[in-house]
Amino acid sequence: MNKLRSSAITQGVQRSPNRSMLRAVGFNDEDFNKPIIGVANGYSTITPCNMGLNKLALKAEESIKRSGGMPQMFGTITVSDGISMGTEGMKYSLVSREVIADSIETACNAQSMDGVLAIGGCDKNMPGAMIAIARMNIPSIFIYGGTIKPGKLHGEDLTVVSAFEAVGQLTSGKINEERLIQVEKNCIPGAGSCGGMFTANTMSAVIEVLGLSLPHSSTMAAEDLEKELSADKSAEILVSAIEKDIRPLDLMTKKAFENAISVIMAIGGSTNAVLHILAIANTAGIDININDFERIRQKVPVICDLKPSGKYVTVDLHKAGGIPQVMKILLNAGLIHGDCKNIEGKTISEYLQNIPDKPPTNQNVIRDIDNPLYKKGHLAILKGNLASEGSVAKISGVKNPVLTGPAKIFESEEDCLKSILNNDIKAGDVVVIRNEGPVGGPGMREMLAPTSAIVGQGLGEKVALITDGRFSGGTYGLVVGHIAPEAAVGGNIALIKQGDLITVDAVKQLIEVDLSDEELEKRKKDWVKPIQKYKRGILSKYSRIVSTSSLGAVTDL
C-alpha cells in the first residue's frame, strides 16, 4: 500500500480526475507511486538576492527526478529590503515573512505534497520558509541562493551598507558626490544576498545549524559552481529523507535552537535573528524565549571578524572553513550540543569529525576560542522601565556600550533621517524612533538609513539610537531595537518626552528613562492610542493580528 501523503490525490478510481490533471503537467503511470516534492522557488528579478535562484531550482528539479521523486515547482514572493529601505515600502518587509510562510504551507498542503525543497535569497525568505516547514512537518530542505561577492573600489571591499553610509558621509562633508556615485556603482557587483554577516547570511547560517540545509552551504557565493552542485545534492538528500521519514521537528529541538543562538553570537550575526528564531521556535512548539539569548550570550564569545562591525565578508568566512569550522570550535569548547542531527540523519559530532579543531593559520576571519574579538556575544537583551518585555542591543564594535543622554524623539524613521541629515543630532543624544513596531508601523521597519547616516557623520560611538522597530543586519553602533511593549500599544516608550534622560547600559543589560513609576503612570493616563492609518489591505490585517516582538512578531499565536 502506498503510504505517501500524496496518495490522497494519486491512488484509486476516485482520483482519476486528479491524475488527469497531473498527467497534463508531465506525470506518467509509474510516477503516481513516487513522492511528490514541492520546489518553492523564490526566483525574482526584484533583487540581486534572488535573481540567481531559478538555475538552482532547475538543478534541484532535475536531481529530484533522477533520485526517484516528482518535483512540482511553485513560486513564492520576495521583497527587497535594500530597495525599500527608508520608504513606506519597508513596512511590507516583515509582513512578507508571513506571506512566504503562508504561501508555502498553502501550496504544499493543498496539493498533498510529500516534501518540500525551499529556495530563497533575501532576508525574509529564510525565516518564512522555516516557519512553513515547522508548521507542516513534512520532510524538507532549504537551499540558500548564496551570498554576493564584495564590490571593489580602489582595493576596498564594499557592501550595500557602504552606500547607506556614504549618504551620511556626503551630508557631513566627508566625501563629495562623485565618491558617492562611485560607491553606488561598485558596491553590488552581481547576484547574491548582501555580503556581510547581515540578516540573510545570518539566517542561512541558522538553517545550516538547525540541520535543514547542507554543511558549508550557507556561506557559498551565489555565482560559484559549488552552489549549483550543492542544490543538486540537497535535492538528492531530500528524497532520501522522505524515504527515511526524517521530519523537521525531529531536528528542531531545544538543543538545536540553542546551537543556532550560540553560532549567531560567535559569527556576530544580525539582531533580526532574535526575532526570527523566536518565531520559528514558537511555530515548532519549542520553548525558546528572549532570555535564552542573554543566557547564551554570556557564555559564547564573538570569534568571527565580519562586517558590518568587522573587516571581512561572508565569502571570506567560507574560504576560512565556513559555519562547520565555527561549530567545531564551539563544540570543542562545550558551547554547542553535538548530539543534534541534520537532514542526512548525522549528528553534529559525526559530520564535524573531519573538520580541523583549530581555524586555518593563513586567515584572520575566524579566531580560536581563546583569542576572541569579544569575550561575550554581541546581541544583548536589555530590560528596564522602557522595555519590560525586553529589547535587543547590538554592541559589536562599540568601545563604550553605556550612554546616558537627552531623548531626541521622532514619530517616524523619515522625520529622524531628515533631522540627522540636517546635522541636528549631537554627541551624547539618545535618538528615539517610536511607533515603528509590529503594530504601530505597522511592519516593524528597519532603521538602516538613520543608523548609517549617524555612522557616516562620525557619531556612531557618541550617539545611541533606540526604537520599537528593527535594525538591518548591516547596522552597527550603540543601537537598541525590538523595544517591547511598543509605543502603539501603550508601552513606556510612548510616554517619554523630548529631553527626558535615557540610559542605555549594555553592561548591566539596562534600558530606562529617568522617571518615577508615578510619573510614568500619570503620563499613561494622558496617552492616546494612535489612529491606525491603514484601514484595508495587508498592513491593516497584519496590525490587527501580529504579536509583540518579544514573541517573534508572529501572526498565528
UniProtKB/Swiss-Prot annotation:
Positions annotated as active site in the UniProt record: S472 (proton acceptor)
Amino-acid positions noted as binding [2Fe-2S] cluster in the UniProt annotation, renumbered to this chain: C49, C122, C194
E.C. numbers: 4.2.1.9
Keywords, sorted A to Z: 2Fe-2S, Amino-acid biosynthesis, Branched-chain amino acid biosynthesis, Iron, Iron-sulfur, Lyase, Magnesium, Metal-binding
Top-level taxon: Bacteria
Pathway this chain belongs to: Amino-acid biosynthesis; L-isoleucine biosynthesis; L-isoleucine from 2-oxobutanoate: step 3/4; Amino-acid biosynthesis; L-valine biosynthesis; L-valine from pyruvate: step 3/4
GO biological process: isoleucine biosynthetic process; L-valine biosynthetic process
Database matches in Pfam families: ILV_EDD_C, ILVD_EDD_N
GO molecular function terms attached to this record: 2 iron, 2 sulfur cluster binding; dihydroxy-acid dehydratase activity; magnesium ion binding
Coiled coil stretches, renumbered: none
Record note on cofactor: Binds 1 [2Fe-2S] cluster per subunit. This cluster acts as a Lewis acid cofactor.
Protein's UniProt keywords contain Iron: yes
Secretion signal span: none
Catalytic reactions on record: (2R)-2,3-dihydroxy-3-methylbutanoate = 3-methyl-2-oxobutanoate + H2O; (2R,3R)-2,3-dihydroxy-3-methylpentanoate = (S)-3-methyl-2-oxopentanoate + H2O
Modified sites of kind N6-carboxylysine: K124
Membrane-spanning residues: none
Subunit composition and interactions: Homodimer.
Annotated protein name in UniProt: Dihydroxy-acid dehydratase
Source organism (scientific name): Prochlorococcus marinus (strain AS9601)
Lineage of the species this protein comes from: Bacteria, Bacillati, Cyanobacteriota, Cyanophyceae, Synechococcales
